[in-house]
A protein has these predicted regions:
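Core catalytic alpha/beta fold that binds nucleotide/phospho-ligands
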Residues: 1-170
Length: 170
């Protein structure tokens, strides 16, 4: 899996962020994958994919200040989040009991929740289910500080103030 991130002005609208994320993807596909004229389509649940035979899998995300994409020969998902206030009830709707305990015991519960959120969103994008599947259906653990979920290779980092996560089928 290759991940690509680009800083953008924080004042961009959602449409401008969307367009910049796709511009990044098209540039990456041309320059690094040799795909000059990609045709992007979407599944019924909204997962973007490249039309054609033997095309790589793609995922895109954007948030205030950055756009990103992931490209892989396997199913892939990427998510970026700008830090924001989160209600406690959001964690209860998204996380398993073990994940909630981890969040509550963290020195920075808001940051820990956003870590789980971006990881779970990247997994749902990888699966192609988006928000149609309950995030409580799977539990992320951390082994030696690295996120883990059977069947997936997970990546997480704080990119400046942003939370960035990616998932790829193992």
């Amino acid at each position: 899996m290759r991940r690509y991130v680009e800083n953008v002005p924080p004042s961009l609208t959602q449409k401008e962020l969307h367009d910049r994320a796709y511009a990044l993807l098209y540039r990456v596909l041309k320059d690094e994958w040799g795909i000059a004229s990609p045709v992007v389509e979407k599944t019924p649940l909204g997962k973007p994919y490249l039309k054609g035979e033997n095309m790589p899998h793609i995922s895109l995300s954007h948030t205030k200040g950055i756009v990103c994409c992931a490209v892989s020969r396997k199913n892939v998902g990427i998510d970026a989040e700008y830090p924001r206030r989160v209600r406690g009830s959001a964690a209860e709707r998204v996380c398993t009991p073990a994940e909630l305990r981890d969040i509550q015991s963290s020195p920075n519960p808001a940051a820990r929740f956003l870590t789980y959120w971006t990881l779970k969103e990247s997994i749902s994008k990888c699966r192609g289910t988006g928000l149609s599947e309950s995030f409580q259906n799977y539990e992320i653990t951390f082994e030696n500080g690295m996120p883990h979920l059977n069947g997936y290779t997970l990546f997480f980092e704080q990119y400046g103030v942003h939370f960035l996560a990616a998932a790829e089928e193992a």
